[in-house]
Amino acid sequence: MLGNEQKIRLLPGDKVQKGKKMKLYIIRHGETSWNKQKKLQGQRDIMLNDAGIRLAELTGEGMKDIDFDLVISSPLIRAKQTAELVMAGRHLPMITDRRIIELSFGDWEGECVRDSKVLPADFIDKFYHDPYHCMRAPGGESFQDVLKRTEDFYQSLVQNKAYENATIFISTHGAAGRCLLANFYDDKEDIWRGGIPKNCSVCIVEVKDGVGTVLEKD
């Protein structure tokens, strides 16, 4: 049940709702105070602010008629809170998976992108306009690191027969979510594809025979 985090995994032969292809609803978490302050959050564990809570609740209202089979969330509190609020009242298992945690900014986490004296002059421009070649923060990750682990996460879903007809809610982050979506495009270097997703924006992906198609993009 949501709210009581369960470390479970469906195995081949377990029952899920049938009669549909695998469908993934990939959401970016709700707003936090650091989002509002334009700070690099990365893997710092920051809770949702009041606006983020309300936005997640509204998103849940908009998704109330969708029959989900399970929830997978980044282990960070802002992603788990978002999942719990969107899925409120449903008796669903929630799995946490570090492969969809946000990109780590290492020593730069907590820096404000508007007035930092620590961030290199071209870092933010690279981050937004050429993320695939963006420099790695000291002690942090590159986008290529996140592409690799989110691809591993995606492959573990499509290779599990128990999931082939499941509808799955995935609560993740801006960079990690876009890296996950890169699995469904030929050009994996164009990570943002037009922009950073807004808080609580949702992308819908349908997977059939191991091939994913983006049905709806935020």
Map each language-model feature to its residues.
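Short beta-strand scaffold positions
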Residues: 73-74, 148, 171-172
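Acidic, low-complexity terminal tails and accessory targeting/binding regions
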Residues: 17-21, 59, 95-96, 103-117, ...
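Short, Lys/Arg-enriched N-terminal segments with co-localized hydrophobic residues
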Residues: 7-21
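GST superfamily/GST-like fold recognition
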Residues: 174-178, 201
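Active-site-proximal alpha-helix that buttresses catalytic centers in soluble enzyme cores
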Residues: 31-90, 96
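Phosphate-handling substructures
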Residues: 89-149, 206
